[in-house]
Amino acid sequence: MANIKVFALGGLGENGKNMYIVEVDEHIFILDAGLKYPDIDMYGVDAVIADMTYLVENKDRIEGVFVSHGHEDHINALPYLLKQIPTRIYGTHFTISLIENLLSDNKMNIKHFKLFRINENKVLGFGDVSVSFFNTSHSIPESVGIAIHTKDGSIVYCTDFNFGPTNYGKYQTSFDKIIDLSKKKVLALLTESIGSGAIDRIKNDSLLEHSYKNILLNMKGRIIISAYSSDLSR
């Protein structure tokens, strides 16, 4: 039987600073590496990241960072991590592109780092352990769930997702792969809980177009619209 440990360095019981660790025997897998913006009473603090001391002390056992998507609370601690641990980073094409921009903004040469683009058909092997992926729907393109497969069963990581329909059909949840995972032995499901208490159905993004048209056509004054830079479809 494999010696399996699962714990969070950040993101558990808080919104942001996502970083989860899965250990399988001698292998360490890092799931996401994000930051958290400070509370209003944390004066002089620009961002909060997880304590990475344990990872630095065990850096020779780390197989890489497996990134679910490109939001700041899931990737923006990577520059701090990579300065201490030059490990491999795995993510979808769009996510890795965001990480490349992030590293460049931090004056870090992307050629010095091991950035690997994956898709949901990619399976990575690390001795007796393998890692697979499945597409999820989110407010950012190319988000994925991650499954770590051991000889005793799988640990499935699926954060920040929804099952709502989208108006950009390229990015959809892979229900077939989720069904395949459910047919195998799943030891643990690590999933997001924000919004889980809401009883309302998620609204289709295409409904925004109708709302905006009404506002734009009837408003006589100035209209200011905020946008989230990574939310390309909206």
Which residues make up each language-model segment?
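His/Asp/Glu-rich metal-coordinating catalytic cores
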Residues: 1-66, 71-234
